[in-house]
């Protein structure tokens, strides 16, 4: 394979090049005036046609990546804006949550890992706080960090070569999940998992059961334009097996005992946070889909 490197026809927008210190004093300048002299983002040049599978006809010049440079820079800036942490601190294994108690648990576990002298080196927190095994009063520093300024604060347990874990508190709703994953996708992470809870729909379920989806009834509509609801989202066998084995490790159960704790079936996602108020309509749809 012969690879040629040439000067790009796309200029790098000034907002993607300047950091906060370099941009000091520019707040008083009209953005339109800056755009006269410096390249600015052209949204018509930014898109997800490759990743969304819209470029399906044969073409001579094949893309080298799912996301081009402009799309990547666009998302890197958004990640920094939403999460309050440097993009370089993001790790390849991602967790999402919308409960602060999971954030607290992750921080406590992360600090324990730092003290154990293992492969994790630092814990980076939204608001510019970074601690390591030698940091005094690390928990207090983290609690006092200005993480509340950011819509989706991130917490990075950093290991070499990005092999650590990142937790992002994405807030409530499927639109938030789409927002952050649209941007995280340019980092090409190994995997991401949502850590939260769902409402059980069957009397055989009890609080604390694990639920592993093998199908989805997608009533959230956030992906309908690029992945219509009639196109199924197939479960990935390797992920399903890994999660099942993890549940067995955590509970210590196996066989029939594990089946009582780990339920598999159809999971409903919805953009109506108050679907219970229209339960008559919802119940019929849930029953038809065999949702759990």
Predicted segments with their positions:
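Accessory terminal and edge-of-domain segments that mediate assembly/interaction
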Residues: 1-191, 199-292
């Amino acid at each position: 394979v012969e690879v040629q490197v040439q000067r790009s026809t796309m200029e790098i927008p000034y907002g993607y090049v300047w950091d906060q210190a370099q941009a000091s004093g520019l707040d008083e300048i009209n953005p339109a005036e800056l755009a006269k002299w410096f390249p600015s983002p052209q949204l018509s040049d930014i898109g997800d046609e490759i990743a969304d599978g819209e470029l399906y006809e044969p073409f001579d010049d094949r893309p080298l990546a799912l996301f081009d440079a402009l799309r990547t820079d666009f998302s890197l800036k958004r990640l920094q804006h939403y999460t309050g942490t440097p993009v370089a601190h993001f790790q390849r294994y991602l967790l999402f949550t919308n409960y602060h108690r999971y954030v607290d648990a992750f921080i406590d576990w992360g600090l324990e890992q730092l003290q154990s002298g293992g492969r994790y080196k630092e814990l980076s927190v939204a608001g510019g706080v970074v601690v390591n095994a030698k940091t005094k009063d690390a928990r207090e520093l983290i609690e006092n960090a200005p993480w509340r300024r950011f819509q989706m604060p991130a917490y990075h347990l950093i290991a070499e070569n990005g092999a650590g874990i990142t937790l992002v508190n994405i807030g409530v709703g499927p639109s938030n999940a789409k927002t952050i994953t649209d941007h995280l996708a340019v980092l090409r992470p190994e995997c991401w998992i949502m850590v939260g809870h769902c409402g059980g729909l069957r009397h055989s379920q009890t609080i604390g059961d694990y639920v592993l989806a093998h199908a989805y009834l997608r009533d959230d509509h956030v992906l309908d334009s690029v992945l219509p609801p009639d196109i199924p989202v197939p479960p990935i066998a390797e992920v399903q097996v890994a999660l099942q084995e993890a549940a067995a490790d955590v509970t210590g159960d196996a066989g029939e005992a594990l089946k009582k704790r780990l339920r598999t079936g159809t999971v409903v996602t919805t953009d109506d946070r108050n679907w219970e108020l229209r339960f008559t309509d919802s119940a019929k749809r849930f029953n038809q889909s065999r949702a759990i």
